[in-house]
Amino acid sequence: MDHSARVYDDITELLPDEENPSPLVRLNRLVPEGSQLWAKLEWMNPFGSVKDRAAWEMVRDLERRGELGPARPGRGIVEPTSGNTGLSLTAIAGVRGYPMLAAVPSKVPAEKKVLLQVFGAKVEVVPDALCPLPGSEDGTIGLAKTHAKASAHRWVMPNQYANPHNVEAHVRTTGPEIWRQTRGQVTHVFTSLGTCGTVMGLSKFLKGKNPAVKVIAVQPSPGHDVPGIRNVSELDVSQLYDPKLVDEVLEIDFELAYTVAAELARHEGLRAGPSSGLIFEGARRTARKAPVPCGVMIFCDDVFKYASNMLKHVPGLQAEP
């Protein structure tokens, strides 16, 4: 296909897959000698994050089963979210003509709450962890479940924390993209832990192609304020996470999520968000111990949604220079 002549019937045709992958970019200035680290730029997806993939997969499943669409007129989507999945679902809901209600933790950055409303979501803010705990009946998950149960004619909850299509999205798209883009040479994959759909899907696909591929999860230290990701100690009730599919879990001081994100911007020209800073630091430490021939890092989203958090954590930044 001649992509230079391609046009699109609507924005969802820009969603990534093996024929239309998100970019894979080599880092050059910050990588230890003898290693190659590549960033998969998920903020280039149409709604701005890796969560576009799972959101689309979950909505399409609901439509196929008649839970959304002409068979259920007026029914919309309700979902607990720390921001990115909610943004993706809200944008897709707008394109498909569905209402959207997002249950959002109070500590989520203001930028994300505003963007959800810009895209048309009704936002209900609840005291909760930055990344809601899977299986919880309280906080944002409890609120979303209450709406879905009490008003089932109005709302359906995809439930990214337990939905197998969250994993399947990465088996179907992200994994095959990486395999094809690296010509099957990928040796390491680095990603974070949130709902765990990304890490589980990547592991299932890539280890199916080559069991020697190392899948490394990078987590923030406890007490962190990095939205959308979690420490593995919080995953005891996760319905998607299988520790047998992860080769190693690296813990990084959460403050580095922000300072390393700034480092990536200043030396590699990448507008990487704090979770990407954390992932890169984990990959860099791995490469310092032993060469990483072909390491792929999932850079989940960009820094713009975290400007207020960057201001708090990166020394020398000023809102009014």
Each model region followed by its residue ranges:
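PLP-dependent amino-acid enzyme catalytic core
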Residues: 1-321
